């Protein structure tokens, strides 16, 4: 079982299946799987090695700023979010598994049940970057320790290299309610999120770490071309002196240097492009220079964010230019 969360305008494509699979989608958020009050709102077949695509066209109809009525006859007031159960079977329902899909109406909504607050724009990691991820405990329990693992390896202590896909899991050793148990630990699986670490990551020169709209920390490797510049301003006074030899007439008494960067992303899919607002509107952003591992606070100066898609970009993948300035200036006297 995995849990996926989407906004109503995001493209919902679930991972490819390993065998020909029949599936059904049931509603809704107030009932548990198998409840008699649930209704099948969609069903279909997906072939081996193919993914279940464009579910947003079906599920987005069930979220609305006004009251809606489910096919089961149950009315939800101001349905800002909805939960669906998607069942899979490869043996004509002799056995089955299910996942949970949560879809929300807009960016102002905050899920009280959400335990993972990070939603990275891409799943690409650089071996030299810091890994940041935010989880919250299930109230009123208190988590005193969180173990972050990728395919069983401790990512916080083990340097990972090579072009490999990793399943990302968060283990909570304390007893947390309503979470599945695994060997005495409680585990949160972030959907089917997989992080890719290319063996030759020469394309990323900078990493941005930022606070997203859910209050969680995310990161973005900048794998496009980048340019660092410096804006220089000077204050001068005129010195009464004989203008000859090495004497200065106009003397610089304060020079201000403001560093700025023009950073370009790699090509993003529709899902990644829709999350760019998290970075461009963030007021807590840090820039890491991978050439020397320095990290400084920066301010994003972009004044707008386009919600780019493959379709509205003329069947091209989206890319963004991020303009940032150093939060602190340098002075020379």
Residue ranges and their predicted role:
Residues 1-200:
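Preference for solvent-exposed, low-hydrophobicity sequence contexts
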Residues 2-3, 11-13, 134-137, 180-181, ...:
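Extracellular/virion structural assembly segments
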């Amino acid at each position: 079982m995995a849990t996926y969360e989407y906004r109503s305008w995001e493209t919902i494509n679930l991972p490819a299946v390993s065998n020909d699979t029949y599936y059904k989608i049931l509603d809704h958020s107030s009932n548990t799987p198998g409840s008699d009050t649930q209704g099948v709102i969609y069903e279909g077949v997906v072939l081996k090695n193919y993914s279940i695509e464009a579910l947003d066209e079906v599920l987005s109809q069930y979220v609305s700023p006004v009251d809606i009525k489910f096919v089961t006859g149950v009315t939800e007031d101001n349905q800002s979010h909805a939960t669906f159960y998607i069942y899979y079977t490869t043996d004509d329902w002799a056995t089955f598994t299910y996942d949970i899909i949560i879809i929300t109406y807009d960016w102002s909504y905050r899920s009280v049940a959400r335990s993972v607050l990070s939603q990275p724009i891409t799943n690409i990691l650089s071996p030299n970057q810091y890994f940041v991820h935010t989880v919250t405990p299930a109230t009123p329990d208190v988590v005193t320790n969180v173990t972050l693992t990728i395919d069983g390896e401790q990512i916080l202590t083990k340097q990972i290299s090579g072009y490999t896909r990793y399943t990302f899991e968060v283990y909570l050793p304390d007893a947390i309610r309503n979470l599945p148990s695994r060997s005495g630990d409680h585990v949160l699986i972030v959907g089917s999120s997989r992080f890719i670490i290319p063996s030759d990551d020469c394309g990323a020169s900078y990493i941005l770490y930022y606070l997203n709209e859910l209050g969680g920390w995310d990161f973005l490797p900048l794998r496009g071309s980048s340019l660092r510049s410096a804006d220089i301003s000077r204050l001068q006074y005129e010195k009464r002196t004989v203008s000859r030899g090495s004497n200065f007439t106009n003397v610089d008494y304060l020079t201000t240097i403001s560093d700025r960067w023009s950073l370009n992303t790699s090509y993003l899919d529709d899902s990644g492009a829709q999350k760019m607002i998290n970075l461009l509107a963030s007021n807590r952003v840090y820039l890491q220079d991978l050439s020397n591992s320095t990290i400084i606070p920066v301010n994003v100066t972009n004044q707008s964010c386009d919600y780019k898609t493959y379709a509205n970009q003329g069947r091209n993948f989206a890319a963004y230019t991020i303009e940032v300035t150093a939060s602190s200036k340098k002075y020379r006297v």
